[in-house]
Every structure is written in structure tokens, then in C-alpha cells.
């Protein structure tokens, strides 16, 4: 049985992308914040003056943009040089340069969807990127951006310790930088150090005056089950008239989420609708999440369709609309955009194995997820489940053996793992063993009072395997199915019921063996 993705919670945690993508998304626009100490560009200016090359121009421009320095004439001169180097610059270099010159088009032209065969991470390329940023670090040891970029590539291949080491240096160099603070917070959320994620945000002296930082602080506190002391500051910024709707989108979204959790739907809708005036990909995905939890919101689809990098929101929207092929394509793009994140793996794989019965694609998505999260027990369980459904029992057992080496496994994942072992036993014609394991999983899942979907999924998987293995349709099966009252959100439960009803309609006269 797969660990369920339909019950996943979502918060407005900052998305961690490259500096150039963050700039393209408009998330580094800086108003004149109080007490802001300007970053010193002197070293970069001197290097550029002495060496008129693309490398030194890019370093100067990156440092200026990342620190909100938009009026430095030397940096603008370097940006103009980059733009004139047609055919020699990368898209990222040109994008950052144009943003400094004020001619950057904030509309990102999305690349075509990645083919699934390209999904598996090329670790050789990742190591090359790490090597590139380490060479820049040797040249510019006081530029925090290069450490942040290196950390992001480290975390893509599951090397969290090295990523944290890099991020610690970046924070030591410039803990006041929005890009550094938000990237660090996302990293520490990824490694489940929520207190550290909160600390780096609060340590930034601009947090009380910067809507992007307040949004992140409120959202991290929601993950910690704590109340934020900056809520009043955030509301004051919203009411000040000093910020554009886009600059406030994550803040209003995080406040909308807070009110939704408290049960004050009227306030929640007010904040969420403000976040949708000019959303980014994060606030749009949060609104889709709220809508899936029965909150009625004012979506302007013309506005939504123009949001840059909105793969997650597109996946959630298509999923709720039962357009599962579109949802899978968007999930794959979401995963390639943020390969360290767990949610696109859960969502994409679930769509593939539950609704499309595309087990090979599901397996590739889960394998990709395990590159960045090698010891995630839910990924391992879901991969074993996928292999078993696809008849690859040797591979399924190899994954089960790998799970046995994982020390920390949550209660819900253990229930899923017991059921998955039952599935494998059934497919190996060990019917009594499979039956016993499923009944054990059903009994354990029945104790999860706040989420009956685990119990329902265990029962439905059990019924399916009984019918497939024995060619016998239990006389009370339709009564059991009628007692499972799934909500519209429980799409996986509904699909499993439909799969069983199809078996019943066929009379189940043919075995899968």
C-alpha cells in the first residue's frame, strides 16, 4: 500500500531555486528597507575593472542583484557587457543582467516538458556544477551566493551535510540577504531542522520590514506549531500601501493559511484572494491547496496562466480536475524544477500508479526522489509497492530489504509497509502470509482516528489482492465497499473501489499469474 499524498499538508515555505530563476520570478525586488546595510561591491568592481571578461562581469552583476543594489554604475556597465556578448552567455547570465538594467521581461518562457527518460538525475552534471561553484568560491570566498548555489546542488544528490556546511558559510557572510535567508530556511526545512529554519529568518534584521521574510517566518512557525510574533507587522505592511500586490503575495497567502487552520474562513478567504491579485508560483499553489480543502476562492485563470514556474499549481489544478495525464506532466516539470522536494515525488508517482497504471513512470519518479532523499522510507515503500504492482517481485523485495536498514519510520509509513509486504506475498502466491499482513495493516490503520483513508486503502488493497489471488469474489464485498464513505478529495480511494468493481463485473475468472 502506498503512503498517501492526498493527505499532505502545505505551507508557504519559500521555494529554493537558482539566483537567476529567483530573479526571473521577481522575488528579489527590494524596497528601501529600514536599517539596511548596503553590501560592499568594491572587490567585485575592482576585479571587473582589471579583467573585462564574462566571468568577472557575471560575478559583479550577481552580487549587485542579489543584494538589491540597482544603482551601481559599474555593475550596470558590467550588465551591458554581458548583454552584448551574444552567443557566449548562458540564459541565466543574460536574465540577471537584464534585470539589473531594468529591461528584464518577468515573463519566463517555459521549456517544453521533460521526457520521462530524461527524468533520472545525471549526477555527473550535478558534480560538475558543484565543481564550478567551488571554483568561484576559491576566487570569491566572500560572495555568499556561490555557497548557496553549491548547497542547492549538494542537496539534489542527497548530500545534506555538505549542503549545510555551505549554507552555514553563506549565512556567516551575509545573514541579512533575503535570498540567503530564504534559501537557508528552505534547506533547514528539508532536513527537518525547523528550529534552525526559524532562527535564520529571525536573525535577519530586516525580517520585521520585509514581507517576503515575514511570510517565510509565519509559515515556518506553522510547521513548528508555534504562533508568530510578526503577524501584526505583516498586517501593517499589507495596509501600508508601500508594497505591490506581488511583493505581498506570499505574506497574504501565509496569513490566509493561518486563518484557514484556525477555522476563520471569512478572514482566510480575504487574505487568499489578496494573494491571488498578483500571485507567484508559491502562493498560487497554496491557493490550489486551499481550494482542494473546500475553501472557495476567486481564481482569475488568465492571471494564473501567466504565473512563472507554476508547475506545482498546474499539477494540483489538473489533478482536482481529473486531468491525470496533464497532472503527471506538470508534476514531472515540478520535480525537475525542485528536485530536492518530496511533494512532487509523492504527487507524480501517485498519479502514475493509481490513476494511469503507468508503473514504469511511477518507478522513475520515485527513483529520482531517492537521489535527493536516499533514506526516505515512504519513497522506498511506494517504490516497492510500484514494483509489486508491475510484477517485478525481485526488485520489490530488494527495496523492502533496503527499508529494513532505515532506523526511523513513522507510524503511517509502517502501516503502508506492512500492507506492501502483504501485496508482495500475495503476488508470490503466499496467500496466507499476504492475508495475515494485510489484516495486521488494517488493524493498525483503524487506530488512526484522524485519517480513515489509511484504513480504507488497506481494506481496498486487501480485497483486490484476495480476488486476484483466489478468483473468488467475497459475498459481502459490495457491503464492505458501501461502508467506505470517501470524500471528493479521496480520489485514490474512489479509484481503488472502481478497480474492484471492475473485477466484480468481470466475474474475475482469469488469474494474473
Where are these regions (language model features)?
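Alpha-helical repeat scaffolds
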Residues: 2, 38-48, 72-85, 93, ...
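Alpha-helical segment of the N-proximal tetratricopeptide repeat
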Residues: 18-50, 59, 65-68, 110-135, ...
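"A position-specific structural signal for the A-helix of alpha-solenoid helical repeats
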Residues: 24, 59-62, 77, 95, ...
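Short coil turns that delineate tetratricopeptide repeat
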Residues: 52, 87, 141, 175, ...
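Start-of-helix register in tetratricopeptide repeats
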Residues: 55, 114, 145, 178-179, ...
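Residue at a conserved register position within TPR or TPR-like alpha-solenoid repeats
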Residues: 64-66, 120, 154, 188, ...
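Structural motif corresponding to the intra-repeat A-B loop/turn of tetratricopeptide repeats
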Residues: 67-69, 123, 157, 191, ...
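Core solenoid repeat modules with strong leucine/isoleucine-rich periodicity
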Residues: 251, 256, 260-270, 274, ...
